[in-house]
Protein backbone atom coordinates (compact mmCIF):
# COMPACT_ATOMS: atom_id res chain seq x y z
CA UNK A 1 0.00 0.00 0.00
CA UNK A 2 1.28 3.50 -0.85
CA UNK A 3 0.31 7.07 -0.02
CA UNK A 4 -0.40 9.84 -2.53
CA UNK A 5 3.34 10.46 -2.93
CA UNK A 6 4.10 6.84 -3.76
CA UNK A 7 5.60 6.12 -0.33
CA UNK A 8 4.72 2.85 1.35
CA UNK A 9 2.38 2.84 4.33
CA UNK A 10 3.03 0.56 7.29
CA UNK A 11 0.68 -2.42 7.11
CA UNK A 12 0.27 -2.05 10.89
CA UNK A 13 0.04 1.71 11.28
CA UNK A 14 -1.91 1.28 14.50
CA UNK A 15 0.90 -0.84 15.93
CA UNK A 16 2.96 1.30 18.25
CA UNK A 17 6.62 0.54 17.61
CA UNK A 18 8.10 3.10 19.99
CA UNK A 19 8.51 0.55 22.79
CA UNK A 20 11.10 -1.26 20.64
CA UNK A 21 13.36 1.77 21.06
CA UNK A 22 13.31 1.60 24.84
CA UNK A 23 16.76 0.81 26.33
CA UNK A 24 15.10 -1.84 28.50
CA UNK A 25 13.61 -3.80 25.59
CA UNK A 26 15.10 -7.33 25.93
CA UNK A 27 16.31 -7.71 22.35
CA UNK A 28 17.95 -4.29 22.36
CA UNK A 29 19.64 -5.00 25.70
CA UNK A 30 21.01 -8.28 24.36
CA UNK A 31 22.17 -6.63 21.14
CA UNK A 32 23.90 -3.79 22.97
CA UNK A 33 25.61 -6.21 25.36
CA UNK A 34 26.91 -8.56 22.67
CA UNK A 35 27.66 -5.95 19.98
CA UNK A 36 28.51 -2.60 21.64
CA UNK A 37 30.13 -1.20 18.51
CA UNK A 38 27.38 -2.33 16.16
CA UNK A 39 24.65 -1.02 18.45
CA UNK A 40 26.31 2.41 18.51
CA UNK A 41 26.52 2.34 14.72
CA UNK A 42 22.82 1.44 14.60
CA UNK A 43 21.91 4.34 16.88
CA UNK A 44 23.89 6.72 14.65
CA UNK A 45 22.09 5.38 11.58
CA UNK A 46 18.84 5.79 13.50
CA UNK A 47 19.53 9.49 14.00
CA UNK A 48 20.21 9.87 10.27
CA UNK A 49 17.08 8.04 9.09
CA UNK A 50 14.91 9.87 11.61
CA UNK A 51 15.99 13.25 10.26
CA UNK A 52 15.54 12.16 6.65
CA UNK A 53 12.16 10.57 7.39
CA UNK A 54 10.78 13.78 8.83
CA UNK A 55 11.50 15.80 5.69
CA UNK A 56 10.26 13.01 3.40
CA UNK A 57 7.07 12.52 5.37
CA UNK A 58 7.84 8.91 6.26
CA UNK A 59 7.01 7.14 9.51
CA UNK A 60 10.04 8.26 11.52
CA UNK A 61 9.41 5.80 14.36
CA UNK A 62 9.27 2.81 12.03
CA UNK A 63 12.39 4.02 10.25
CA UNK A 64 14.28 4.54 13.48
CA UNK A 65 13.34 1.04 14.69
CA UNK A 66 14.47 -0.48 11.39
CA UNK A 67 17.81 1.31 11.78
CA UNK A 68 18.27 0.23 15.39
CA UNK A 69 17.78 -3.45 14.53
CA UNK A 70 19.03 -3.71 10.93
CA UNK A 71 22.28 -5.36 12.06
CA UNK A 72 20.95 -7.35 15.01
CA UNK A 73 21.98 -10.57 13.23
CA UNK A 74 25.59 -9.70 14.00
CA UNK A 75 24.96 -11.00 17.51
CA UNK A 76 25.55 -14.48 16.10
CA UNK A 77 29.25 -13.73 15.51
CA UNK A 78 30.07 -10.23 16.84
CA UNK A 79 33.87 -10.50 16.81
CA UNK A 80 33.92 -10.84 13.01
CA UNK A 81 32.66 -7.26 12.55
CA UNK A 82 35.25 -4.50 12.77
CA UNK A 83 33.19 -2.19 14.98
CA UNK A 84 33.21 -4.85 17.72
CA UNK A 85 36.90 -5.69 17.51
CA UNK A 86 39.72 -4.48 19.69
CA UNK A 87 42.72 -3.00 17.93
CA UNK A 88 44.79 -6.16 18.28
CA UNK A 89 42.19 -8.65 17.07
CA UNK A 90 40.81 -9.42 13.63
CA UNK A 91 39.78 -13.04 13.01
CA UNK A 92 39.63 -12.37 9.26
CA UNK A 93 43.42 -12.07 9.11
CA UNK A 94 43.77 -15.83 9.06
CA UNK A 95 40.77 -16.61 6.85
CA UNK A 96 40.27 -17.07 3.13
CA UNK A 97 38.49 -13.92 1.84
CA UNK A 98 35.55 -15.94 0.57
CA UNK A 99 35.03 -17.53 3.99
CA UNK A 100 35.05 -14.03 5.47
CA UNK A 101 32.47 -12.98 2.89
CA UNK A 102 30.21 -15.88 3.85
CA UNK A 103 30.46 -15.03 7.55
CA UNK A 104 29.74 -11.33 7.08
CA UNK A 105 26.90 -11.81 4.61
CA UNK A 106 25.15 -14.25 6.95
CA UNK A 107 24.04 -11.43 9.24
CA UNK A 108 21.22 -10.52 6.85
CA UNK A 109 19.47 -13.89 7.19
CA UNK A 110 20.25 -13.92 10.91
CA UNK A 111 18.64 -10.50 11.31
CA UNK A 112 15.48 -11.68 9.56
CA UNK A 113 15.30 -14.80 11.72
CA UNK A 114 15.80 -12.90 14.97
CA UNK A 115 13.19 -10.24 14.14
CA UNK A 116 10.62 -12.78 12.95
CA UNK A 117 11.16 -14.86 16.09
CA UNK A 118 10.70 -11.82 18.32
CA UNK A 119 7.14 -11.40 16.93
CA UNK A 120 6.93 -7.67 17.67
CA UNK A 121 8.34 -6.53 14.34
CA UNK A 122 5.89 -6.10 11.42
CA UNK A 123 6.87 -7.75 8.14
CA UNK A 124 7.38 -4.50 6.24
CA UNK A 125 9.88 -3.33 8.86
CA UNK A 126 11.78 -6.62 8.61
CA UNK A 127 11.89 -6.17 4.85
CA UNK A 128 13.38 -2.69 5.24
CA UNK A 129 16.02 -4.02 7.63
CA UNK A 130 17.02 -6.95 5.45
CA UNK A 131 17.34 -4.97 2.20
CA UNK A 132 19.89 -2.48 3.53
CA UNK A 133 22.83 -4.08 1.68
CA UNK A 134 20.91 -4.98 -1.46
CA UNK A 135 23.34 -6.77 -3.77
CA UNK A 136 26.35 -4.65 -2.80
CA UNK A 137 29.86 -6.01 -3.29
CA UNK A 138 32.13 -6.60 -0.30
CA UNK A 139 34.97 -4.80 -2.01
CA UNK A 140 37.50 -5.34 0.76
CA UNK A 141 37.29 -9.12 0.62
CA UNK A 142 36.92 -9.18 -3.17
CA UNK A 143 40.06 -7.08 -3.61
CA UNK A 144 41.92 -9.29 -1.13
CA UNK A 145 40.99 -12.42 -3.06
CA UNK A 146 42.37 -13.55 -6.39
CA UNK A 147 38.87 -14.01 -7.75
CA UNK A 148 37.92 -12.26 -11.00
CA UNK A 149 34.15 -12.63 -10.58
CA UNK A 150 32.93 -9.85 -8.30
CA UNK A 151 29.43 -11.35 -8.25
CA UNK A 152 30.74 -14.09 -5.96
CA UNK A 153 31.32 -11.39 -3.33
CA UNK A 154 27.93 -9.70 -3.59
CA UNK A 155 25.27 -9.83 -0.90
CA UNK A 156 22.62 -12.28 -2.06
CA UNK A 157 19.64 -10.28 -0.82
CA UNK A 158 17.09 -8.20 -2.69
CA UNK A 159 17.75 -4.68 -3.92
CA UNK A 160 15.71 -2.12 -1.97
CA UNK A 161 12.23 -1.77 -3.43
CA UNK A 162 10.77 1.04 -1.31
CA UNK A 163 11.83 4.55 -0.37
CA UNK A 164 12.20 3.35 3.23
CA UNK A 165 14.63 0.58 2.28
CA UNK A 166 16.65 2.93 0.09
CA UNK A 167 16.84 5.56 2.84
CA UNK A 168 18.17 2.96 5.28
CA UNK A 169 20.71 1.72 2.73
CA UNK A 170 21.97 5.25 2.07
CA UNK A 171 22.15 6.20 5.76
CA UNK A 172 23.87 2.94 6.72
CA UNK A 173 26.48 3.35 3.97
CA UNK A 174 27.08 7.01 4.79
CA UNK A 175 27.48 6.36 8.51
CA UNK A 176 30.04 3.62 7.85
CA UNK A 177 31.94 5.78 5.36
CA UNK A 178 31.86 8.76 7.74
CA UNK A 179 33.22 6.69 10.61
CA UNK A 180 36.08 5.43 8.45
CA UNK A 181 36.95 8.88 7.10
CA UNK A 182 36.87 10.44 10.56
CA UNK A 183 39.22 7.77 11.89
CA UNK A 184 41.61 8.56 9.03
CA UNK A 185 41.30 12.33 9.53
CA UNK A 186 39.80 13.13 6.12
CA UNK A 187 36.08 13.63 6.76
CA UNK A 188 34.20 15.96 4.39
CA UNK A 189 30.41 15.60 4.71
CA UNK A 190 29.54 16.68 1.17
CA UNK A 191 32.12 14.38 -0.39
CA UNK A 192 30.88 11.47 1.73
CA UNK A 193 27.28 12.08 0.62
CA UNK A 194 28.01 12.56 -3.07
CA UNK A 195 30.46 9.68 -3.44
CA UNK A 196 28.43 7.21 -1.38
CA UNK A 197 25.18 7.88 -3.22
CA UNK A 198 26.96 7.93 -6.58
CA UNK A 199 28.50 4.51 -5.87
CA UNK A 200 25.12 3.06 -4.92
CA UNK A 201 23.45 4.51 -8.00
CA UNK A 202 26.18 3.29 -10.36
CA UNK A 203 25.83 -0.20 -8.89
CA UNK A 204 22.09 -0.19 -9.56
CA UNK A 205 21.04 -0.24 -5.91
CA UNK A 206 18.83 2.88 -6.11
CA UNK A 207 16.98 2.26 -9.36
CA UNK A 208 13.60 2.83 -7.69
CA UNK A 209 14.59 6.19 -6.20
CA UNK A 210 12.84 9.32 -7.45
CA UNK A 211 15.17 12.18 -8.37
CA UNK A 212 13.23 14.62 -6.19
CA UNK A 213 13.43 12.36 -3.15
CA UNK A 214 17.15 11.84 -3.69
CA UNK A 215 17.82 15.57 -3.60
CA UNK A 216 15.79 15.93 -0.40
CA UNK A 217 17.77 13.09 1.16
CA UNK A 218 21.09 14.70 0.22
CA UNK A 219 20.09 18.03 1.77
CA UNK A 220 18.78 16.39 4.95
CA UNK A 221 21.92 14.28 5.35
CA UNK A 222 24.15 17.30 4.82
CA UNK A 223 22.57 18.86 7.92
CA UNK A 224 22.83 15.62 9.90
CA UNK A 225 26.48 15.11 8.97
CA UNK A 226 27.46 18.66 9.78
CA UNK A 227 26.33 17.91 13.33
CA UNK A 228 28.19 14.61 13.34
CA UNK A 229 31.29 16.35 12.02
CA UNK A 230 31.32 18.64 15.05
CA UNK A 231 30.96 15.67 17.42
CA UNK A 232 33.39 13.41 15.51
CA UNK A 233 31.51 10.08 15.51
CA UNK A 234 33.48 7.95 17.96
CA UNK A 235 33.37 4.26 18.79
CA UNK A 236 36.13 4.36 21.39
CA UNK A 237 33.69 3.92 24.28
CA UNK A 238 32.32 0.79 22.65
CA UNK A 239 35.87 -0.53 22.34
CA UNK A 240 36.46 0.29 26.02
CA UNK A 241 33.27 -1.60 26.92
CA UNK A 242 34.55 -4.62 25.02
CA UNK A 243 37.93 -4.44 26.71
CA UNK A 244 36.30 -4.17 30.15
CA UNK A 245 34.19 -7.27 29.48
CA UNK A 246 37.31 -9.23 28.51
CA UNK A 247 39.06 -8.22 31.73
CA UNK A 248 36.20 -9.28 34.00
Feature names for model-found ranges:
Residues 1-32, 248:
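Non-catalytic interface/linker regions that flank or bridge core catalytic/transmembrane domains
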Residues 10, 15, 22, 156, ...:
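Regulatory/sensor and coupling segments of signal-transduction and defense proteins
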Residues 28-41, 46-190, 199-203:
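Divalent metal-dependent catalytic cores for phosphoryl transfer on phosphate-bearing substrates
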Residues 11, 20-21, 144-150, 154, ...:
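Histone-fold modules and their flanking histone-like tails across chromatin and transcription assemblies
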Residues 6-8, 53, 62, 244:
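Low-complexity, compositionally biased segments
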Residues 201, 205-248:
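Long, hydrophobic alpha-helical segments that serve as membrane-spanning/inserting helices
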Amino acid sequence: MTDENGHSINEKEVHDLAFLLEPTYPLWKEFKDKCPGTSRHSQAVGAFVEGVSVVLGLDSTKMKVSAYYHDVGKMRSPKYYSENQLEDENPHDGLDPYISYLIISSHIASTAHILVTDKNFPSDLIEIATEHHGTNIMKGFFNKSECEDENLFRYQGAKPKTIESMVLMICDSIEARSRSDIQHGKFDPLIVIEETISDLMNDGQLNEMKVGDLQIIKEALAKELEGSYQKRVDYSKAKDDLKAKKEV
